[in-house]
């Protein structure tokens, strides 16, 4: 779950302290005692790249919609009352930054800024350089600790007391930073590069799957298809729709397509820019963040099947609105497809799991509000 700080300035103060304490403290008390000058310079270079990437992640605006933006006909028309303009696809209004953010990923407390289309490469490079620097330091500290342990029978004056104290303090602290940032970095790669999604869009995908498993999504998708593509309401498609609702139980991936996901390399080029600029501190993503290319599955073809029409719906395919719950007293009907058999069971409603999009939360306890989104503007 995203961290919420009582005093927002701590979001900058804590990382600044950790970078300074671990980085410069390790250099002064440990590395300067035995490491060669070229290796010390390399370490300081990595440390400087952390500072530069961090500064850019903090100070770079995550991206705001173009003035007088008009949405194309193939996306939902979402009007932001606070900005008094339409929101481009994948955009959300941040309640902290008080602006609509292009391809909003989340509001980061550690940068006091949103992570969005324009500064996502800076944020990812910031994480990358932390991992590189702490990994190098971890290896150096491990070798140094092993060396001191081998010489433990020597008199104490052979080693500086300050080095031993700092090794004791900084080694576990550095390992903790390395572990946590690596997990965050891998999550970013998994969401954005592997699946082409922001954290909010991954959350939305979980929400849609929850709606699908509870039997409340299919009807909404069919209704949206009739509304957006009225010409697709043929006799055969109506028959297929009835079968989906009463007999045939399609898989989730047969009805829901994330339109902005391509292969891994294309996703990386889209969000990080050309490959030769991935490590360049000022590298920017491809495009303007107001319009995004879509995969072939999302292309609408009038003569296609009902499933193809549903897959071509704009994101999110339910329009961001939750369909009516099929309630029977105080319970909820859930339908699942296991091993080719349709299972129907009655479940007691779970607080928050069958709520509207603005109040729904995932298995991590994350709601739309936790990502910094102004839910009143959704």
UniProtKB/Swiss-Prot annotation:
Domain DHHC: 78-128
Gene Ontology biological process terms, A to Z: protein palmitoylation; protein targeting to membrane
PTMs per UniProt: Autopalmitoylated.
Impact noted for substituting residue 108 to R: Reduces, but does not abolish catalytic activity. Lacks autopalmitoylation
Reaction(s) the record says it catalyses: L-cysteinyl-[protein] + hexadecanoyl-CoA = S-hexadecanoyl-L-cysteinyl-[protein] + CoA
Ranges facing Lumenal side: 31-40, 141-164
Secretion signal, residue range per the UniProt entry: none
Active site: 108 (s-palmitoyl cysteine intermediate)
Record carries keyword Plastid: no
InterPro entries assigned to the protein according to its UniProt record, in alphabetical order: Palmitoyltrfase_DHHC (IPR001594), PFA4 (IPR033682), PFA4/ZDH16/20/ERF2-like (IPR039859)
Origin: domain of life: Eukaryota
Disruption phenotype: Leads to the retention of non-palmitoylated CHS3 in the endoplasmic reticulum and reduced levels of chitin on the cell wall.
Cytoplasmic side: 1-9, 62-119, 186-378
Protein family per UniProt: Belongs to the DHHC palmitoyltransferase family. PFA4 subfamily.
Name this protein carries in UniProt: Palmitoyltransferase PFA4
Lineage: Eukaryota, Fungi, Dikarya, Ascomycota, Saccharomycotina
């Amino acid at each position: 779950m995203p961290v919420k700080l009582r005093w927002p300035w701590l979001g900058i103060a804590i990382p600044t302290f950790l970078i300074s304490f671990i980085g410069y403290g390790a250099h002064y008390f440990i590395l300067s005692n035995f490491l060669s000058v070229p290796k010390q310079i390399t370490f300081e270079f990595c440390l400087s790249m952390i500072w530069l990437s961090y500064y850019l992640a903090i100070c770079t605006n995550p991206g705001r919609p173009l003035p007088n933006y008009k949405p194309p006909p193939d996306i939902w028309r979402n009007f932001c009352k606070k900005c008094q303009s339409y929101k481009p696809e994948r955009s959300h209004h941040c309640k902290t930054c008080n602006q609509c953010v292009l391809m909003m990923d989340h509001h980061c407390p550690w940068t006091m800024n949103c992570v969005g289309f324009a500064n996502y490469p800076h944020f990812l490079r910031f994480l990358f350089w932390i991992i590189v620097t702490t990994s190098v330091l971890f290896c150096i500290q491990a070798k140094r600790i092993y060396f001191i342990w081998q010489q433990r029978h020597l008199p104490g004056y052979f080693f500086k007391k300050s080095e031993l104290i700092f090794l004791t303090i900084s080694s576990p602290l550095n390992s903790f930073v390395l572990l946590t940032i690596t997990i965050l970095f891998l999550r970013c790669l998994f969401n954005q590069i592997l699946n082409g999604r922001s954290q909010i869009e991954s959350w939305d995908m979980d929400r849609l799957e929850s709606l699908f498993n509870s039997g409340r999504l299919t009807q909404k998708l069919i209704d949206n298809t009739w509304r957006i593509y009225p010409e697709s309401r043929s006799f055969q498609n109506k028959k297929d729709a009835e079968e989906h609702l009463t007999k045939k139980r399609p898989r989730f991936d047969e009805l829901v397509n994330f339109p902005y996901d391509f292969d891994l390399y294309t996703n990386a080029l889209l969000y990080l820019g050309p490959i030769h600029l991935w490590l360049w501190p000022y590298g920017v993503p491809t495009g303007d963040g107001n319009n995004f290319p879509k995969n072939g599955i999302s292309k609408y073809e009038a003569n296609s099947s009902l499933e193809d029409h549903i897959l071509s719906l704009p994101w999110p395919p339910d329009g961001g609105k939750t369909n009516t719950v099929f309630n029977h007293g105080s319970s909820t009907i859930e339908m699942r497809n296991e091993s080719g058999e349709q299972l129907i069971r009655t479940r007691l409603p779970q607080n928050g799991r069958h709520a509207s999009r603005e109040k729904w939360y995932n298995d991590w306890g994350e709601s739309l509000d936790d990502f910094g989104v102004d839910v009143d503007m959704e």
